[in-house]
Amino acid sequence: MNPFLNTAFKAARKAGQMMIRAAGNLDAVKVDSKAFNDFVSDVDRSSEMILVEALKEAYPHHKITCEEGGSHGKATAEYEWIIDPLDGTTNFLHGHPQYAISMALLHKGVLQEALVYAPERNDVYMASRGKGALLNDRRIRVSNRIELNRCLIGTGFPVVDQSMMDKYLAILKDFLAKTAGGRREGAASLDLCAVAVGRLDGFFEFNLKPWDIAAGALIVQEAGGIVTDMSGNEGWLESGDIVAANPKVLAQMLKIIADHQ
């Protein structure tokens, strides 16, 4: 584990321990609504504080971009951390274990390091550009399925932007008719990690934020998968529209989506 990932892991583990304690008394967790179907809790904020403080201490010249607290550090910094302190807030608030801490490091705008930590399972996914992806220190690879009708596809509902719902449901209906099934777990970082480890053969979702997908996407890529936008191009980090899959089914997924564009 290199120094960047070591620092990220120590901070994520500390934040994760706080989350586990908070999960034992959810009635005491304070919750605010940022927008329709978009919640933030004091656990999100506490986690972000732990992560930011650790990164500032270790790397005072790095920029840090967070879901809740915005940006810290110089806008011109060569290194930038993109952090989701609690991906899957709604799951957490309902006692579902599918939530995670997501941390990615960019150098001059290029993803270099990624860590996704799932506290309930104590699972640590990580990747370094050009060096592969790991789950709990074990190398992982995407699935090798070819036939779409044998594939399990992950997705996320556009619950915040309801204007996209009709288009999304038409795409989802097409996927469900042509695959072995669909899964909606409610934490994009973990959905992407599921693609990386082969539990899902592909994943797609619209209108995500950089902190939702940056770390998970690099983990998919380093596990042998491909990540694109809905048209098969780069730019998914900026647009938030993402498709991730093993190389053998990506084109088939993009074809289904293109039929509804």
PLM regions: where:
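Oxyanion/phosphate-interacting regions
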Residues: 1-13, 169-177, 190-261
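A short, compositionally biased
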Residues: 26, 99, 127-131, 221
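Residue-level signal for inorganic ion chemistry
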Residues: 19, 44, 55, 89, ...
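Generic detector of well-ordered alpha-helical packing
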Residues: 45, 49, 68, 85-88, ...
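N-terminal subdomain of lithium-sensitive/metallo-dependent phosphomonoesterases centered on the IMPase/IPPase/PAP
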Residues: 1-86, 226, 248, 255-258
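Glycine-rich active-site/cofactor-binding loop and its immediate structural neighborhood
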Residues: 79-121
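Acidic beta-strand-loop-alpha-helix segment within the catalytic core
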Residues: 104-192, 239-261
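Short secondary-structure boundary/capping segments
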Residues: 31-32, 56, 71-74, 116, ...
